[in-house]
Amino acid sequence: MKKRSHWLAAGALLLGMNVAQADDSNTLYFYNWTEYVPPGLLEQFTKETGIKVIYSTYESNESMYAKLKTWKDGAYDLVVPSTYFVAKMRNEGMLQKIDKSQLSNFSNLDPDLLNKPFDPNNDYSIPYIWGATAIGVNTDEIDASKVTRWADLWKPEYKQSLLLTDDAREVFQMALRKLGYSGNTRDPAQIKAAYLELKKLMPNVLAFNSDNPGNPYMEGEVNLGMLWNGSAYVARQAGTPLAVVWPEEGGIFWMDNLAIPANAKNRAGALKLINFLLRPDVAARVAETIGYPTPNLAAKALLPPTVANDPSLYPPADVIKKGEWQDDVGEASVQYETLFQQLKAGR
């Protein structure tokens, strides 16, 4: 997932403890995104299993990755990397294989959301929450029928009005799809072509925002741009007339996944927590709290029909098929990030 606004579940955090202070079998160190666990949920897990959860949070895949690289002695037992970071960490030997025979609730997951390129057969990751980046349109100000493609954002009529996410891979993926390329390309020439295309877009860009991209729409600062579908849902719940348009070139799909670090000390406990989080009642509670789609079909069946049948949250199969899941691009990530910083600096 991306950066988010901040709230912490009261009572769920036990910070500042030395890893060696607790019995490994009765203590689980869970490192997760901010806003990703409903209040009281981990206490419920502890009550049911006797396993105490030491919970801490991060705001980017990069900070989670750096922490795991720094701590070599098994500081965490369960983490939640996004799509292409699963592939990166798997390829670097940072994750261990997951024994799915210990996950009785694995069958609740949507088969269409399994076996993605970033982790074939889900050997190293289990879907937790998923989402997509598409086009957000304030329908009180802009006719959504006139915005059907990523390419429409380049129209001169939208000068100094667009919001883009502050995410190199997403912004470049938009341009790459516009040009007919894969958003996961490692080809330097294609990445450079996307950069040149984005330079043409910059006169239309008002702001980059990945802290909470729904807020500028809610506050009336922008009416058009890139937007995560979960952020759009939250904004609509607050009364903002915000539509999600699935671009004809394809949306950008991502997934946040439960994974066990290679040096985790409490593998058995991690498997128990994963299985707990895959329970229909638990997964439904998570989805309702954070406002993003659940990959759990049994949980989706428990959601209010207005949520479960919302095509902006749960896009039709043809929309998903047309879109593209983010994957690791290896060393090409340096070129993406370098050019993205140049783009924002006006160079």
Where are these regions (language model features)?
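Extracytoplasmic ligand-binding site segments that recognize negatively charged/polar headgroups
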Residues: 75-76, 80-86, 90-221
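A bilobed periplasmic-binding-protein/Venus flytrap-type ligand-binding module shared by bacterial periplasmic
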Residues: 134-141, 177-178, 255-267, 285
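Periplasmic-binding protein-like
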Residues: 192-200, 236-262
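Mature extracytoplasmic/periplasmic domains
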Residues: 261-321
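Conserved C-terminal helix/tail region of periplasmic/extracytoplasmic solute-binding proteins
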Residues: 317-347
